[in-house]
């Protein structure tokens, strides 16, 4: 996808893998303390800092822990959020993201999923190929789970029932 030039964003990553020539994109990476240095910035530290800036896009290259809570907070407060997380399908990736949020917070799984329903699309990739895309269309109070609409699965696109 393309981020419009009038939008700003932060890209938070462990190593400098993601890049762009976008004029208003801020890049931050993890710093490990080495030797006598006491300076250390984790993905979580950088995510917390990202919430203090005026951004349209909030991007974390790969979520693996407590930074998930701040990513969820950014999504819940209207940022456009992009990240990667390991899962076996597009729908299971959201459950894994909820797990990571749970590590950092005392929110219930249901509360986490209610907040995560602001994430609009989930893309599942395998062997560098898109296998599945799901749209998050809401949260079900009956099943206490996210409600998805399949968009794409292994070469097949699904029609949106909301379109004529």
Model regions and ranges:
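Switch/coupling sub-region of P-loop NTPases
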Residues: 2-115
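Conserved P-loop NTPase
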Residues: 116-164
């Amino acid at each position: 996808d393309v981020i419009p030039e009038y939008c700003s964003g932060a890209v938070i990553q462990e190593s400098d893998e993601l890049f762009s020539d976008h004029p208003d994109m801020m890049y931050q990476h993890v710093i490990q303390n080495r030797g006598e240095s006491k300076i250390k910035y984790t993905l979580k530290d950088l995510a917390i800092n990202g919430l203090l800036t005026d951004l349209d896009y909030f991007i974390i290259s790969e979520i693996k822990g407590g930074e998930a809570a701040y990513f969820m907070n950014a999504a819940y407060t209207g940022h456009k959020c992009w990240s990667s997380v390991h899962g076996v399908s597009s729908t299971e990736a959201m459950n894994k993201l909820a797990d990571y949020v749970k590590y950092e917070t005392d929110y219930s799984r249901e509360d986490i999923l209610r907040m995560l329903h602001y994430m609009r699309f989930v893309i599942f990739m395998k062997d560098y190929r898109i296998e599945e895309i799901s749209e998050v269309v809401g949260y079900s109070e009956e099943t206490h789970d996210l409600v998805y609409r399949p968009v794409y699965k292994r070469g097949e696109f699904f029609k949106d029932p909301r379109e004529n």
